[in-house]
Amino acid sequence: MRGAPGIGSATVRNDTPMAIVLVDAENVRRSTWPNIGKDELERLCAEWAHARGHDVRVIWETNEIADDRIAREVRELDPPIWIVTSDRELRERVRDHAERIIGGGSFARELRA
């Protein structure tokens, strides 16, 4: 890791995103009780991204499985890329390309802090 600030650390905003953060939406949504609603997760991620200057992309299941999309995008996008998931299989698939992998529960708690 190249000295990237951790979750919750203060950063100076600028026009360049510090990292592209790919969020495994269903994994994060279901990581706390009560579960985070879809709209609430989108709103919280947008607020978190704005406050920290990151480009956060919340990935939902569509015609492409979310895990497959995240694994593909982490290879295609320019670093630094952070992945938010607690899914062991997905973590294995992205570990060589992600600068940082954040657990879904940790991220959900940070969003609600």
Task: Mark where each language-model region is.
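N-terminal amphipathic/basic-hydrophobic helices that include classical n-h-c signal peptides
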Residues: M1-P17
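Nuclease catalytic cores that cleave nucleic-acid phosphodiester bonds
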Residues: R13-A113
